[in-house]
Curated annotation (Swiss-Prot):
An individual GO BP term: DNA-templated transcription
EC numbers: 2.7.7.6
Function: DNA-dependent RNA polymerase catalyzes the transcription of DNA into RNA using the four ribonucleoside triphosphates as substrates.
Top-level EC class as recorded in UniProt: transferase
Catalytic activity annotation: RNA(n) + a ribonucleoside 5'-triphosphate = RNA(n+1) + diphosphate
Top-level taxonomy: Bacteria, Pseudomonadati, Thermodesulfobacteriota, Syntrophobacteria, Syntrophobacterales
Oligomer and partners: The RNAP catalytic core consists of 2 alpha, 1 beta, 1 beta' and 1 omega subunit. When a sigma factor is associated with the core the holoenzyme is formed, which can initiate transcription.
Transferase in keyword set: yes
Keywords, comma-separated and alphabetical: DNA-directed RNA polymerase, Magnesium, Metal-binding, Nucleotidyltransferase, Transcription, Transferase, Zinc
Classification via SUPFAM superfamilies: beta and beta-prime subunits of DNA dependent RNA-polymerase (SSF64484)
Recorded GO CC terms: DNA-directed RNA polymerase complex
Gene: rpoC
Keyword Lipid biosynthesis listed: no
Protein name: DNA-directed RNA polymerase subunit beta'
Cofactor requirement: Mg(2+); Zn(2+)
């Protein structure tokens, strides 16, 4: 009985283990696993369908085909359990052992394992110091290798050709030993003394000075050390015996019609067995050497193909011309074991169907079709029916459910009540793509979804489908309810603002409610309370839009009826002022945010639901609709267009007269049209946005229009100003697919209709948009995958790591304007030191406290500009990040809890908006979004002008001209605080003087945005140097205008440097500043503006460099730029940056490059070579600081790291990534990018190993490095030195500690090969490894601390 009982027992927890180790298996190990040798290539007998004996499916080796039944049928049933049949040799046992029992094949001749041979760097090659070519020659029987030179002049490991070998044998006879094939390689490997080798190599390394040699030695040492430290033997990389996979993992399935479907592995094994058997037979027959050799080579190839098809030689194809899937292919790629079956499993208890809107659901509910619920909750229903006594057996319950009797439906209702289900919409780009709801049973076949959660799911109702999943265990239900319920996910984890915000109809309805209409019924009446207003409205005495006065508390408030009705749904804690305005989408989002912060989560949920109901009701009542009459075309449109045409004509004239180049003509034309489009749009908005309403007494008031199109755009419900511009203004400039802007715009709008040509130009942009969208999705998904992989194991690991370090944050400025306030950047972070009031020096925020909304207000009021905060970048936790360094968990609005998987949240927050980023496209059906070039700066606040680091001269017209690069103008308020600051472009005309008081909006400076001038600071006569026509300068004749201009061209000679010098009246070169000379070097492409001998005044333009033809403003924009930053690739034409502070000088030019010399006050000068034709942005005598670029272009992040250190490079990466997202209007909190950058900066490169075991140039994780160094210091040994290392996200993911995680990411075979040689142990610390091993993840409720609670 006991035995029977053990059969039905539930299996206990699967094998409990703490780590996984991977090794190379020894031949003994393989024989140990095996249950018998496979000797024949046969599979099964096609007539009896029984497996052949000793074949690939042999029942004697692998176990019976049917449960408890031997092959010949002598023993059947349970009573013979464990008996081995004497007739057919099959053990009587469950057939599932065929999934786990392995066999083996004894090879007649050893073969090399292809992974250890071909996976670069080749493991076998590195141990023997042979190249891959040489190794293959030996293994594939092309050359002999010397095993023992004996008394000959040969060396061990030398290769001999066939002829050379014969010759040596004739000369020396058997005085030396050489071999061929895998046997000889095996002999060499077995004879290696690794300890001795390692010592020799280390010595050699310390002696050599050549970098290349050192790298090579380090590579070899790494592999030798791996073998030394693991228990692997090098000769195991050559195999005498190969394992055979259990047959049920490579099944053979009979199809109808007597044919079989088989796994490719069976074909591959069959080839190996056939060749092996043939080789054995040939060896027995003592066949000639050449035949045996050929057979051995074929065996080696067959085994290669079995392990990794296509790695060497031709890919073997099956009968259907498709490549056969080898063992490696089973693991690799999206369809491989890792990503298909371990990381992405399909689950039971799930269903999917179309979604429809559920306008009367509460936020925590979803509508579930009864049919679906019945299927999903079957086991629960069976259980309940039995409990209630309707049925006695499961079978009866099943029948009852199939008949769908009334009791079944009642039971279903009971089961479903308060049972959360999870809804998921693919693609799940962030964690809000799966949320839990309580199901409400409905008729019909579609899931009903609450409209407010659509933003989070990115769902709409045009045929989207969603999947339902049922959490089965009590723990799963609790997690679904507490963590995943839609009501607990009001804030977005990416930026901490509410994500449950009304949109579309709801916004429109509430906007309509809160608008004011003049002369409405009941205008200016006074009411004593909200209730009174409600009565008047219900009785029809006051209109919804009437302006009224209402007593609120103890004051009288001017408001409208609609706003009072809206205020009825507000929670107590919120003031009436929150809704006493026109409510558009932005204001509504703010309302929900305010409610969350003041009244709490429950009130917010109720408010959201009530807003939804009100919004729908009033949107319906308003009866808004669009007609063609609503698109009013501005009266001044034709006038604006005529002006623009005239301006363009004027530019054409200037071009024809040769005053400007073709590029400038194009730039200016594009600019004029961009401005004209803006003007038409502004006129249209003016006309559509206001309307004059006549009163009963004939008086009129101008108010915001009730034009439906305007109302939809203005409320943020649908459409944008841009789209309105295209409907009723003009379509404007369009872009070619290449990204250039076509200089003739589309002057028509959709209301007027487009001509055929205009329509054709439009299709250009529109089609490119569609093609791009398809590419973008794939690219964005790949970026997300890499981000998740690099940061998956970052979790909150401890409350405080105790670091004293942090980062400095200030408001983000661009062109003098604040784009992101300091408050927005520090909200929810922890102060790293006391934050003091700059005036009173009182502590506003003590060190180590959270900077919350109130404290942000204090900091901003005090006018503090820079704050030091804790950051993930400087966190000292060994694994993960501590709560203090991370700060607030944005989705909850309070400090993060231990176990929060912040790495994955960071990756999702950055990856999810990826699809909204451009792949260099232009929005709005391809209308070019070209910002009108800035040509001037105006201040925003009153104050006094201060010039900072600004050199100026007066030119011949008496204007002040800026003569240097990094000059700035700042506006100082009366209290002496700096209000704003602007960088002044070189060559700008300054309209104010230092110390001048200015009013707001004064013109400070202006410049020509389309050219960069080269100016002189001194007076004198112009003298050309090395400017020779036909060599370095050409008179370029403009074909259209017949005018000529002098242009500097590319020149061959390296010592020629075209320049203009300014000579004084004595004919000497004039002096500039402290000992510099007035020589100006002309870059390629400069257009000379003066002639030889001209009289020159200070501030004159000697030459101008036309800017590149305007492409739409982003060099590498959008998604590719984000990927480039995270992969830290060198930008295409990266800027050279200076490594030291110093003064700029120019040296002798070399071939195609110009030499810039930076001379510091003390120490050696540094030379930088800059390609000719690149515009150098510094001048002789300029003072530069370390890290400043010397030319135009994006800097290379690696340079920033070496010059300015980790914090600066982190700051650069965070700011650059943010800039791309900001251009698209996407909000992401800095801390997410910091978490990713932390992972990129996790390692150091060893520069000096000291007394440690490290190798020169090895990459080591910081904690490990520090730990070993502290040990060395304790033992009074020399610690190792290292420099910080910045790895791209792909590189960083592949070099993680966990080989399981790395193998499931990319380059599976390489990762596994490296891991096996090193005998790596995976301690399963990250999330991914645990998912793959099928365990709970060590984050959130799966953390060890919480797991103990569960027990």
């Amino acid at each position: 009985m006991k035995e029977l009982y053990s059969l039905f027992m539930k299996p206990k927890d699967p094998l409990h283990f703490n780590a996984v180790k991977i090794m190379i298996s020894s031949p003994e190990r393989i024989r140990e696993w095996s249950y018998g040798e496979v000797k024949k290539p046969e599979t099964i007998n096609y007539r009896t369908f029984k497996p052949e004996r000793d074949g690939l499916f042999c029942a004697r080796i692998f176990g019976p085909i049917k449960d408890y039944e031997c092959n010949c049928g002598k023993y059947k049933r349970m009573k013979h359990r464990g008996v081995v049949c004497e007739k057919c040799g099959v053990e009587v046992i469950q057939s599932k052992v065929r999934r786990e029992r392995m066999g083996h094949i004894e090879l007649a001749s050893p073969v090399a394992h292809i992974w250890f041979l071909r996976s670069l760097p080749s493991k076998i090659g590195n141990l023997l110091d042979l190249t891959l070519r040489e190794l293959e020659k030996v293994l594939y029987f092309d050359s002999y290798i010397v095993l023992d030179p004996g008394d000959t002049p040969l060396t061990k490991g030398e290769l001999l050709t066939e002829e050379k070998y014969r010759q040596m044998v004739q000369e020396h006879g058997s005085g030396f030993v050489a071999g061929i094939g895998a046997e000889s390689i095996k002999q060499l490997l077995a004879g290696l003394d690794l300890e001795k080798l390692a010592v020799e190599l280390r010595e050699e390394m310390s002696k050599t000075n050549s970098m290349a040699k050192r790298k090579k030695l380090a590579k070899r040492l790494k592999i030798i050390d791996a073998f030394r430290e693991s228990e692997n033997r090098p000769e195991w990389m050559i195999m005498d015996v190969i394992p055979v996979l259990p047959p049920d993992l490579r099944p053979l399935v009979p199809l109808d019609g007597g044919r079989f479907a088989t796994s490719d592995l069976n074909d591959l094994y069959r080839r190996v067995i056939n060749r092996n058997n043939r080789l054995k037979r040939l060896q027995e027959l003592n066949a000639p050497d050449i035949i045996i050799r050929n057979e051995k080579r074929m065996l080696q190839e067959a085994v290669d193909v079995l392990f990794d098809n296509g790695r060497r030689g031709k890919t073997i194809t099956g009968a259907s011309k498709r490549p056969l899937k080898s063992l490696s292919d089973m693991l690799k790629g999206k369809q491989g074991r890792f990503r298909q079956n371990l990381l992405g499993k399909r689950v039971d208890y799930s269903g999917r169907t179309v979604i429809v809107i559920g306008p009367n659901l509460r936020l925590h509910q979803c509508g579930l079709p009864k049919k679906m619920a019945l299927e999903l909750f079957k086991p629960f229903i069976y259980n309940k029916l039995e409990e209630k006594g309707y049925v006695t057996t499961i079978k009866a319950a099943k029948k009852m459910v199939e008949r769908e009797t009334p009791e079944v439906w009642d039971t279903l209702d009971e089961v479903v009540r308060e049972f959360p289900v999870m809804l998921n919409r693919a693609p799940t780009l962030h964690r809000l793509g799966i949320q839990a709801f309580e199901p409400i049973l409905i008729e019909g076949k579609a899931i009903q979804l609450h409209p407010l959660v659509c933003t989070a799911f990115n769902a709409d109702f045009d045929g989207d489908q969603m999947a339902v999943h049922v959490p089965l265990s009590i723990e799963a239900q609790a997690e679904a309810r507490i963590l995943m319920m839609s009501t607990n996910n009001i804030l977005s984890p990416a930026h901490g603002d509410p994500i449950i915000v009304p949109s579309q109809d709801i916004v429109l309805g509430i906007y309509y409610m809160t608008r004011e209409k003049p002369f409405a019924k009941g205008e200016d009446r006074v009411f004593s309370s909200r209730e009174e207003v409600r009565c008047a409205f219900d009785a029809g005495e006051a209109d919804l839009h009437a302006r009224v006065h209402v007593r609120m508390g103890d004051e009288r408030v001017k408001t409208t009826v609609g706003r009072v009705l809206l205020s009825e749904i507000l929670p107590e804690e919120m003031p009436f002022s929150a809704v006493n305005r026109v409510m558009n989408k932005k204001v509504l989002a703010g309302l929900i945010d305010m409610c969350y912060r003041t009244a709490g989560i429950k009130a917010t949920v109720l408010l959201a639901d009530r807003l939804k109901d009100l919004g729908y009701e009033y949107a319906t009542r308003s009866g808004l609709s669009i007609s063609i009459k609503d698109m009013t075309i501005p009266h001044r449109k034709s006038e604006i267009l005529d002006q623009a045409f005239d301006l363009v004509k004027e530019i054409e004239r200037q071009y024809n007269e040769g005053l400007i180049t073709e590029g400038e003509k194009y730039n200016k034309a594009v600019d004029i049209w961009a401005k004209a489009t803006e003007d038409v749009a502004a006129e249209m908005m003016k006309e559509i946005a206001t309307t004059e309403v006549g009163g009963p007494e004939g008086e009129a008031r101008v108010v915001e229009a009730f034009n439906p199109i305007f109302m939809m755009a203005d409320s943020g419900a649908r459409g944008s100003k841009d789209q309105m511009r295209q409907l009723a203004g003009m379509r404007g400039l369009m872009a070619k697919p290449s990204g250039e802007i076509i200089e003739t715009p589309i002057t028509a709008n959709f209301r007027e209709g487009l001509t055929v040509l205009q329509y054709f130009i439009s299709t250009h942009g529109a089609r490119k948009g569609l093609a791009d969208t398809a590419l973008k999705t794939a690219n964005s998904g790949y970026l997300t995958r890499r981000l998740v992989d690099v940061s998956q194991d970052v979790i909150i690991s401890e409350p405080d790591c105790g670091t004293m370090d942090g980062i400095e944050v200030e408001a983000l400025l661009e062109a003098g304007e604040i784009i992101q306030r300091l408050g927005d950047r520090i909200l929810g972070r922890i102060a790293q030191e006391d934050i003091l009031d700059p005036v009173t020096a009182e502590v506003l925020v003590p060190m180590g406290t959270e900077i919350d909304e109130q404290r942000v207000q204090l900091i901003e009021d005090a006018g503090i500009e820079k704050v030091n905060i804790r950051s993930a970048l400087t966190c000292r936790s060994l694994r993960g990040v501590c709560t203090m360094c991370y700060g607030r968990d944005l989705a909850q609005g309070k400090l993060a809890q231990i176990g929060e998987a912040i790495g994955i949240i960071a990756a999702q927050s950055i990856g999810e908006p990826g699809t909204q980023l451009t792949m260099r496209t232009f929005h709005i059906g391809g209308t070019a979004s070209k910002s009108i070039e800035r040509t001037s700066i105006n201040n925003r606040y009153a104050g006094t002008v201060r010039f900072l680091n600004l050199n100026t001269v007066h030119n011949r017209d008496g204007d002040l001209i800026a003569m240097n690069r990094n000059g700035e103008i700042s506006i100082i308020s009366e209290s002496g605080r700096e209000r704003e600051r602007y960088v002044i472009i070189y060559g700008a005309k300054l309209k104010v003087t230092d110390g001048q008081p200015v009013e707001p909006d004064t013109l400070l400076a202006e410049w020509d945005p389309f050219t960069t001038p080269i100016l002189t600071e001194v007076a004198g006569a112009a003298k050309f140097g090395d400017i020779v026509e036909g060599q370095t300068m050409q008179e370029k004749l403009d074909p259209v205008t017949g005018k000529s201009s002098k242009v500097v061209v590319e020149y061959r000679e390296s010592d020629v440097r075209p320049r203009i010098s300014i000579k004084d009246d004595k004919g000497k070169t004039a002096r500039v500043g402290e000992g510099g000379f007035a020589r100006y070097f002309m870059p390629v492409g400069a257009i000379l503006m003066v002639n030889e001998g001209d009289a020159i005044f200070p501030g004159d333009v000697l030459a101008r460099i036309p800017r590149e033809t305007t492409k739409t403003k982003d060099i590498t924009g959008g998604l590719p730029r984000v990927a480039e930053l995270f992969e830290v690739r060198k930008p295409k034409e990266h800027a050279v940056i200076t490594e030291i502070d110093g003064v700029i000088g120019f040296g002798k030019d070399t071939k195609g490059k110009r030499k810039v010399i930076v001379s510091p006050e003390v120490g050696d000068a540094r030379d930088y070579l800059i390609p000719k034709g690149k515009h150098i942005s510094v001048h002789e005598g300029d003072y530069v600081r370390a890290g400043e670029p010397l030319m135009d272009g994006s800097p290379n992040p690696h340079d920033i790291l070496t010059v300015l250190g980790e914090k600066e490079v982190a700051k650069y990466l965070v700011d650059e990534v943010q800039q791309v997202y900001r251009l698209q209007g996407v909000k992401i909190n800095d801390k997410h990018i910091e978490v990713i950058v932390r992972q990129m900066l996790k390692r150091v490169r060893i520069t000096d190993p000291g007394d440690s075991e490290f190798l020169m140039g090895e990459h080591v994780e910081k904690p490990i490095f520090e730990e070993i160094n502290s040990k060395l210091t304790e033992e009074d040994k020399r610690p190792a030195a290292a420099e910080p290392l910045l790895l791209g996200i792909t590189k960083a993911s592949l070099s993680t500690q966990s080989f399981i995680s790395a193998a499931s990411f990319q380059e599976t075979t390489k990762v596994l090969t490296d891991a096996a040689t090193a005998g790596k142990v995976d301690y399963l610390l990250g999330l991914k490894e645990n998912v793959i091993m099928g365990r709970l993840i060590p984050a959130g409720s799966g953390l060890r601390t919480y797991r103990e609670v569960r027990k």
